[in-house]
């Protein structure tokens, strides 16, 4: 049953992404939201199919640029990479990146994954997969409206890293 759910979730994510693009929207997070509703384990299942390593990029500034540079460097070596290029870096966006890179049979043929993750979303994303490497660009106080003090952001990252134990 879980394989069937994964296949349906992948199809739904791809169809949602396509429909949003033809109507002039990105639709990345909506595609991920729908995929997770159909198969709550889709991120765990697809990320487990990455052959080599999973890189996660976090930080206040420069996440998208750093993540996309890392992805480009790996692709230049002829490797297949799952990447959330658009910076959709919360749970739905990350799920969409994996689902939209999967085949219609619900399988992922990727050597690496380069995933940008919002600092506060690490605690929601890391239970689904454990990255092999984390690139932390920086932590600044420019998002006080979202996270309060920088210590709160740092504690969120520490809590997320407890999943490694």
Language-model features: locations:
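Phosphate-binding loop of NTP-binding sites
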Residues: 4-165
């Amino acid at each position: 049953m879980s394989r069937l759910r994964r296949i349906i979730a992948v199809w739904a994510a791809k169809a949602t992404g396509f429909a949003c693009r033809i109507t002039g929207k990105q639709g990345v997070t909506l595609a991920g939201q729908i995929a997770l509703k159909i198969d709550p384990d889709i991120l765990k299942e697809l990320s487990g199919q990455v052959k080599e390593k999973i890189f996660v990029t976090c930080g206040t500034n420069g996440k998208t640029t750093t993540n996309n540079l890392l992805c480009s460097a790996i692709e230049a070596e002829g490797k297949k990479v799952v990447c959330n290029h658009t910076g959709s870096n919360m749970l739905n966006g990350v799920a969409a990146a994996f689902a939209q890179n999967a085949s219609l049979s619900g399988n992922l043929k990727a050597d690496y994954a380069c995933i940008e993750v919002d600092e506060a979303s690490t605690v929601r994303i890391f239970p689904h997969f454990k990255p092999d490497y984390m690139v932390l660009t920086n932590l600044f106080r420019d998002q006080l409206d979202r996270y309060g003090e920088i210590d709160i952001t740092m504690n969120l990252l520490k809590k997320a890293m407890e999943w490694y134990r």
